[in-house]
Swiss-Prot record:
Glycosylation sites: 83, 135, 291, 423, 530
Protein known as: Polymeric immunoglobulin receptor
Organism: Equus asinus
Upper lineage: Eukaryota, Metazoa, Chordata, Craniata, Vertebrata
Chain ranges passing through the membrane: 637-659
Xref: CDD domains: IgV_pIgR_like (cd05716)
Length: 762
């Protein structure tokens, strides 16, 4: 059962073999008697550099027989004509074989370690005879894209007869290609012809221009159509050019330099990639056309007849054969001259990974991490914007030396490059984003081109996380505090302020680092980062950035412009200015009001119901301690009100004490829970209608109040389910005491009102 289950799994999920990181030439065509050189690449790890390198030939049973290895072994077939050299610093080894014979044709492997263990690459070697006559057959060996002129002899008896050439196919059937009567096979149209020189010559020539791979094969020249016709056999070998090997890591960059010679210096050049259908898809040409598959990842230039193409952010599908040629319309065709490259993309890469897309919001910022070769610490780092135009290009925006001058107007206060020597990366920060900033950007250095990279910036909907005022105006000599608000998710991040210039953004010292003209401090509770500029001068004018970092990696930034103005005459108001986001100021003030208890004497004095106009007018004005009327009569009102009220309260306390002592034995034990609240005397009016509650506004379920800036919450619960109809309550001594206390409060309230009316009427 288990075996059946595993079989089903293998049927649904086929085994995926890991691609070998060893790379070499897939095909080699050579002529007999010449020599060949096979170059193989391997990942330059410490283990691979010291491991055995070998060149072996595959046998009919799948075994690979070693011919030569780096351990010093050389087979009998290779003695005296082969050698193997290892280049560990570049991760390559080269096998040279001299005095090639046709018997050397076959399938081989170049590898690292032990034969048949997977760390190898398959190579096919074809050795063809040189041009000449071999066993009565004329042999021609010409390069792909070249030209061949085949001589076809015949006897004088066939001078008046038709001359023709046919090509043999697999079943030994000969298909006519061309004849002297005017016929020409379509695939040879425009590039093949017959030349018959005079009427006395016993030889005609079959000429093929722009040789193609399909032209390789056996031909028959014939003069006359019957059995008496003259025939001659021809063997044509079209030699494929050995492509230049290009070994690159996944995510890195490559460059193809196409130099086809002075004869086509003014002809349009093209670069194409061979696909599985054996057609060549255009990558780019000198006419400005580019394949959309490489959008944002390709740069090309044509200088002095050399067509250079850079491809960055390499993908697995970028591997393959690339051809460069010349054609008037810039489209790929089988032409000569031609250059070829075989690109291998190593998926077991040590190249630093990074996002190919970064997203930002309007008004926000992005931080792009760019890799460079750690061995080139002193190289000039740059950042450019890729242009999707016919001429293409990538104009520089910023370098490690500062902002590019012709970009100052568009990127003033917005762009900076942080060079971080030693860790192999540099950071580019762009803030105050707009929708027009979307596009592709390239990370460049003037060193190793393989470390170039590109990133796509997308603008999405959203709001910036950091908030500052856009502009702050301050007068000379004043002190200004810039406030930057950050969300709680940045709580553990390092916050900073810096002053932007076209040379970079210089960090300002923190409060712990010493006092100076600019001091930074951060209030973690309110998530505010404050920058204080003391005694502002004209030199303080400019852009200031607030930002956050996670470790050594920059995250988000926001910019504010400080404008310094001359001191106004007679202004003399504030000696310091505080600039903060408006919404933060509102939230802070509201929070403070909510927690503040306003003690208004009016609550304890004037509590009788009044006309709305009087309540909105005179009473509020008189209660304002800041008004002149309130200050003028405050002392008289206090004396005339508080003294009689104190006497009445003392008398009331005495009466209540006597009554309670008198009925103490009959009074039930009462547990009183105290609470604090603000009470006005009007709360005691009609107290009997409310069950003599001391606080009419209090909820029967819960009571909450704020006093002295602290919150106290008291919750009380009662049983709302009536289980038995209550009997008519018998009035107890406790109730009599409560009624007496209520009557006293009502009387005190009336006395206080009469006393207040007296001074007001006076």
């Amino acid at each position: 059962m288990t075996l059946f289950f595993l079989t089903c799994l293998l049927a649904v999920f086929p085994v995926v073999s890991m691609k070998s990181p060893i790379f070499g030439p897939p095909e080699i065509d050579s002529v007999e008697g010449t020599s060949t050189s096979i170059k193989c690449y391997y990942p330059p790890t410490s283990v691979n550099r010291h491991s055995r390198k070998y060149w072996c030939r595959q046998g009919p049973k799948g075994q690979c027989i070693t011919l030569i290895s780096s351990n010093g072994y050389v087979s009998k077939d290779y003695e005296g004509r082969a050698n193997l050299t290892n280049f560990p610093e570049s991760g390559t080894f080269v096998v040279n074989v001299d005095h090639l014979i046709q018997g050397d044709s076959g399938s081989y492997k170049c590898g690292v370690g032990i034969n048949n263990r997977g760390l190898s690459f398959d190579v096919r070697l074809r050795v063809v005879p040189g041009s000449g006559v071999l066993n009565g057959t004329q042999v021609y060996a010409e390069d792909l894209g070249g030209k061949v002129s085949i001589s076809c002899p015949f006897t004088s008896a066939n001078l008046p007869n038709v001359k023709s050439v046919c090509k043999q196919i697999a079943d030994k059937h000969c298909v006519r290609v061309i004849d002297s009567a005017g016929y020409k096979e379509p695939s040879y149209e425009g590039r093949a012809k017959l030349i018959i020189q005079g009427t006395t010559q016993t030889e005609f020539f079959f000429i093929i221009d722009q040789l193609q791979v399909e032209d390789d094969g056996k031909y028959v020249c014939q003069a006359g159509d019957d059995s008496s016709g003259d025939k001659s056999n021809v063997d044509l070998h079209v030699l494929k050019p050995e492509p230049e090997l290009v070994y690159a890591d996944l995510g890195s960059s490559v460059r193809f330099d196409c130099a086809l010679g002075p004869e086509v210096v003014n002809v349009a050049k093209f670069l194409c990639q061979k696909n599985k259908e054996k057609t060549c898809n255009l990558v780019a040409n000198t006419l400005g056309q580019r394949n959309q598959t490489f959008k944002g990842r390709i740069l090309s230039q044509n200088n002095n007849g050399v067509f250079s193409v850079d491809i960055t952010n390499l993908r697995k599908e970028d591997a393959g054969l690339y051809l460069c040629g010349a054609n008037s319309d810039g489209q790929p065709q089988k032409s000569r001259p031609i250059q070829a490259w075989q690109l291998f993309v190593n998926e077991e890469t040590t190249f630093p990974s990074r996002p190919s897309v970064v997203k930002g919001v309007v008004g926000g910022s992005v931080a792009v991490l760019c890799p460079y070769n750690p061995k080139e610490v002193n190289s000039v780092k740059s950042w450019c914007r890729w242009e999707d135009t016919q001429n293409g290009g990538c104009p520089l925006l910023v370098q490690s030396t500062g902002l590019v001058k012709n970009q100052y107007e568009q990127y003033n206060g917005r762009l900076v490059l942080y060079d971080e020597p030693g860790n192999g990366t540099y950071t580019v920060i762009l803030n105050q984003l707009t929708a027009q900033d979307a596009g592709f950007y390239w990370c460049l250095t003037n060193g190793d081109i393989h470390w170039r990279s590109t990133v796509e910036l997308k603008i999405v909907e959203g709001q910036p996380n950091l908030k500052v005022p856009k502009t702050v105006n301050v007068e000379l000599g004043e002190t200004v505090q810039l406030t930057c608000h950050s969300p709680c998710k940045f709580y553990s991040y390092k916050k900073f302020w810096c002053k932007w210039t076209d040379q970079g953004c210089s960090a300002l010292p923190s409060q712990d680092e010493g006092s100076g003209q600019a001091v930074v401090n951060c209030d973690q509770n309110s998530q505010l980062i404050n920058l204080t500029l003391k005694q502002v001068t004209k030199g303080d004018e400019g852009w200031y950035w607030c930002g956050v970092k996670e470790g050594l990696q920059y995250k988000e930034t926001v910019a504010v412009y400080v404008a310094v103005k001359e001191k106004g005459t007679g202004s003399g108001a504030l000696s310091s200015v505080r600039a903060a986001p408006a919404e933060d100021v509102i939230e802070t003030s509201v929070r403070k009001v909510d927690r503040k208890v306003v003690q208004d004497p009016r609550l304890f004095v004037d509590t009788q119901a009044k006309d709305p106009e009087d309540a909105a007018g005179g009473s509020i004005a008189s209660a304002d301690p800041g008004s002149s009327a309130g200050q003028g009569g405050s002392s008289k009102v206090v004396v005339s009100t508080l003294v009689p009220l104190a006497l009445v309260l003392a008398l009331g306390v005495l009466v209540v004490g006597v009554l309670r002592a008198r009925h103490r034995k009959n009074v039930d034990r009462i547990s009183i829970r105290s609470y604090r609240t603000d009470i006005s005397m009007s709360d005691f009016e009609n107290s009997r209608d409310f069950g003599a509650n001391d606080n009419m506004g209090a909820s029967p379920v819960s009571q909450e109040t704020t006093l002295g800036g602290k919150d106290e919450f008291i919750a009380t619960t009662e049983n709302t389910v009536e289980t038995e109809e209550p009997k008519k309550a018998k009035r107890s001594s406790k109730e009599e005491a409560d009624m007496a206390y209520t009557a006293f409060l009502l009387q005190a309230n009336n006395m206080a009102a009469n006393i207040q009316d007296g001074p007001s009427k006076a």
